[in-house]
Regions:
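Long, compositionally biased, intrinsically disordered regions
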Residues: 25-388
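N-terminal single-pass transmembrane signal-anchor helix
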Residues: 1-29
Length: 388
C-alpha cells in the first residue's frame, strides 16, 4: 500500500517536471524555428537580389554609359554587361556609377527604390580573388619592387604565381622650369614568379641621361590558377588623390576629388596611356593632338575635362595611366603618375557601395565570382532587414 502511494507520488512529480519542461521548452523551440525560418527567408531574398544585381543589365541596357548621366532616367537597376553570353560579367561603366566620388553617381537610396528594398539594407563590395602586398622604391636611376601574394581567406602564401610587371616613370632635370625639364618613359613588361613564400622581387635600371627619376609605378598583372588581378605599386601614395578618373563608353572624364591632396593648383595632362594586360598604349601626348594641352582647375568651367577615344570601350583597358604636371607643396613643379578608374593600390578590397551592416540585425552574406574589365573579382552582398 505504502509502495503504491509512493509510486503515485513519484509519477506525479515526474509528470509535473515534464509539464514544466514542456511549457518552458515549447516557446523556445517555437522561437528557434521562427528565427530559422526568418533567416532562411532573409537568405532567399538576398539570393534573389544578388542575382538581380549581377545578372540583369538594367534599363536602359546602357544606363551606365549615358552622358550626361541622370539617375532618374534609370528605370531598372542591374550591373551586367549587355551580352547574352556574358554571365556574371559586369559592365565597368555601371560599376563606376556606384562610386560616391563619381561626378555622375547613382545614389544608394535610388538603387533601394529601383530594387523595391524599402524594408532592407545592403552593402555591395568587390574584393580581389587573392591578397597582394607590395613595396616600390626609387633612386635617381633604379626602380625596385617586391610583392607577396597570399590567399585572402587565411594568408597562406601562393607559390608560382605569375607576376607580369610593366614600369612607367617620370623624371626631371634642373632647373625644373620649362616643359623640357620633365619627361615620362614607359618600359616593356617583365615576367616574374613567386617563390615558396609567395614573394618575388625585381628592379628596373634606367638610362635617362641628365634626368633623375621622380615618380614610378609598377603595373603588376598577377595570375593564379587562371584567376588574374591587377595591382598598381607606386613610390608616393599621397599623390593618388590629386585627380578622379572615370570612363564611360569611349569617354574618359577627369575631375577634382572631394578631398584635395597637397595642392589646389591646376592639373595639366601631359600623357595618357592605356594598359591592356600586355603593354601600355599611348592615347594622348600633349602637343601631338588637338587640343595641344589639357588642364583642369578649380576655376569656373575647368572643374571637369572629358575626351573621347573611339574604340576605347572595345579595348576595355584595365588601367588608365596619366602623367600630370602639378605644383606640390614643399616640392614645387613636378610630373606625377595617377592611375584609374578603380582603386588599384589596395591589396584586397577594391570597392564598396552602401552603408556598413548594423551589428544588431541578422545579416545574410552572399559571394560570387564576377568579371570586370577582364579581371576576376569576388563580389559580396551583405543583406539585412532594417529595424522597424
Amino acid at each position: 500500500m505504502v509502495s503504491a502511494a509512493y509510486d503515485h507520488m513519484v509519477a506525479i512529480v515526474i509528470v509535473g517536471m515534464i509539464f514544466v519542461a514542456t511549457v518552458v521548452a515549447l516557446p523556445a523551440i517555437s522561437y528557434s524555428n521562427m528565427a530559422t525560418v526568418d533567416q532562411q527567408q532573409l537568405r532567399n531574398t538576398a539570393y534573389s537580389v544578388f542575382d538581380a544585381m549581377l545578372l540583369d543589365v538594367g534599363s536602359p541596357s546602357n544606363w551606365g554609359s549615358n552622358l550626361p548621366f541622370d539617375p532618374n532616367k534609370v528605370e531598372k537597376f542591374g550591373l551586367a554587361y549587355a551580352d547574352p553570353f556574358s554571365k556574371f560579367v559586369l559592365d565597368s561603366d555601371k560599376v563606376q556609377r556606384l562610386d560616391p566620388a563619381n561626378p555622375g553617381v547613382i545614389e544608394y537610396d535610388r538603387v533601394v527604390d529601383l530594387l523595391n528594398l524599402e524594408e532592407y539594407g545592403f552593402q555591395l563590395s568587390f574584393y580581389r580573388p587573392f591578397s597582394v602586398n607590395w613595396t616600390l622604391d626609387i633612386t635617381n636611376t633604379v626602380v625596385r619592387f617586391s610583392t607577396t601574394v597570399t590567399r585572402s581567406e587565411d594568408g597562406t602564401p601562393i607559390p608560382n604565381a605569375e607576376v607580369r610587371v610593366t614600369f612607367m616613370v617620370t623624371a626631371s632635370k634642373l632647373p625644373k622650369q620649362d616643359d623640357g625639364d620633365f619627361i615620362s618613359e614607359k618600359y616593356d613588361p617583365k615576367t616574374y614568379y613567386t617563390n615558396v613564400t609567395g614573394s618575388c622581387a625585381g628592379f628596373l635600371s634606367t638610362n635617362l641621361g641628365e634626368y633623375n627619376i621622380d615618380y614610378a609605378v609598377a603595373i603588376m598583372h598577377i595570375t593564379v590558377a587562371g584567376l588574374s588581378t591587377t595591382v598598381l605599386a607606386q613610390n608616393a601614395n599621397p599623390i593618388t588623390n590629386l585627380i578622379k578618373i572615370n570612363t564611360f563608353g569611349d569617354t574618359i572624364t577627369l575631375s577634382f576629388p572631394d578631398n584635395l591632396n597637397d595642392t589646389n593648383s591646376e592639373r595639366r595632362i601631359k600623357e595618357i596611356d592605356a594598359y591592356d594586360f600586355k603593354n601600355l598604349m599611348r592615347l594622348f601626348k600633349a602637343g601631338d593632338v588637338n587640343p595641344p594641352e589639357v588642364k583642369i582647375t578649380k576655376g569656373s568651367g575647368y572643374e571637369y575635362w572629358s575626351i573621347s577615344f573611339p574604340g576605347l570601350r572595345a579595348v576595355n583597358p584595365s588601367v588608365l595611366l596619366f602623367a600630370l604636371q602639378v605644383t606640390l607643396k614643399g616640392i614645387g613643379r613636378t610630373l606625377v603618375l595617377i592611375a584609374g578608374p578603380f582603386s588599384f593600390g589596395d591589396s584586397e578590397k577594391v570597392f564598396a557601395f552602401g552603408p556598413d551592416p548594423q551589428s544588431e540585425n541578422p545579416i545574410a552574406i552572399m559571394r560570387r565570382l564576377v568579371v570586370i574589365s577582364d579581371m576576376t573579382y569576388i563580389s559580396q552582398l551583405a543583406f539585412w532587414r532594417e529595424q522597424a
